């Protein structure tokens, strides 16, 4: 009789289809995948769901900017997201889209059910709305007058809307959180939700909009579309066959409640306040745990296109490989605090942890086995006391990894596994196989040492599978080792004595030269900037800032007519020595070349300006700046933050063309 396996239902937040996900977004799916794979290895019947969130005002606006329908827009982005999830070797069981017909039908039924039972009522909304976050806020919730979640401006919104009676369920939710300490993790997230939202008192939630149309219509009042979060959150139940009429699927009855909702810390409020209250209203059990993971930051800031610091998964994979990227994002992210990714840190980890600690260990062990015994690995029983310590470390690692994974401390679990590999490297130093090989009388001892190394690496590789699955396969193939069951991973000595390792060991991870990597990174960044510039008309149109200047003294047309403005072409540019601000330009204006000195060194690299068409005041009296003659002025614009950009003609114009 087949053993009944315990179920484990894990979800990620569904990715918002406003654009291509960067590595910070991608971290979540890799983290969830490592947990799902580990649970499968432990014997759980795992169902792992992810997908895309495809409705909302932001998407409607982006589609309009792109000149296509919202459905065409989300089809393109959802396909790209799925491609990246697959590129990262994630083992999801279902990829749901909120534009799926069965999901939309259930959302309409859920809305109607909540309305019929009095949890939703019709009213009038007037307040503040953040379009990127699809969220409403009161004045008191804003931070410096802006959205508390993303920091962008909010806009006044006034429209007829349906509301959900959040306050009706708030006491019940507070009691639930207090009696289920494991529900919101880490604990700091729980404290934030209780102190900032629940205990001060919940306001009723606006759950429909009439100011845009890209959403799921309210079935009995189709001028309203369902609030995107009511739509998106229900994917966790609609994706596994929930039906609010009482005809839910066998799969739903088996899987719900979810064991883990894995989400970013920025959307913890929606998942630990709105979502559980919706479930209470539907008379459904709450998920067992919601884990709000930290952000993966680029350098010292959150990744965003507007900051120009975006790192994409496919660029990382092209440079380092899938498993190296998986290793980095899983190992470098703390349990609670934000992690940091930089190209330099990636190279450092690749060289120290992957190429040296792991890759060199495997390569040395296989090479010594081939050199001394033709690749044959034999257990001789010629043991010494130092072996006991190695075996103790190796056989204890499984339990240590399991304990860390139970707490979702994935980075710590990987540290335990790499601790095993480090212990193997230390064992080589302790036993000195090269010295044993010089003494024929110590042949049996040498064989035992190499057997212990192969066995230890095999166990470590099997434990590594949830995090770096391709690397596990490569190691086991080179060792000619069978994949072990989870139950066997604390047993030492199962490698078949007499097996032969490969006689052609492959380097698992090449050492990288930081200079070469950064040259490739520069190419990537140049391409990104070019792509962003080309797509600038399709990017989200942020509310443009305006700057009011103190008016200067009026001038007459005659005064203005004295100034001559022409188009110039920059043909060379050099920094001015001993100056922190100045660049010296050679600018072609008509048939002449003028030298112009400008204080924009902080905003442009000299090489980036060559070939630019710029606007030049050409009849300004020449003057010396830092000892260099300047024969004109380059026209620039400056924003409120002091950022400066050169003014350039909208269309291609010849050098010397008059600006009038």
Model-derived segments and spans:
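Intrinsic disorder at enzyme termini
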Residues: 472-559
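A glycine-rich helix N-cap at a beta->alpha junction
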Residues: 78-93
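Helix-rich, typically C-terminal accessory recognition domains appended to large enzymatic cores
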Residues: 122, 345-383, 393-501, 617
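Phosphate-backbone binding interfaces of nucleic-acid-interacting proteins
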Residues: 538-660
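N-terminal catalytic cores of NTP/NDP-binding nucleotidyl/phosphoryl-transfer enzymes
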Residues: 2-77, 96-111, 116, 133, ...
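Beta-strand segments within the central parallel beta-sheet cores of soluble alpha/beta enzyme folds
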Residues: 289-292, 476-478, 584
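Cys/His-rich short segments
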Residues: 117-170, 174
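Structured secondary-structure scaffolds
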Residues: 2-50, 102-106, 156-371, 413-417
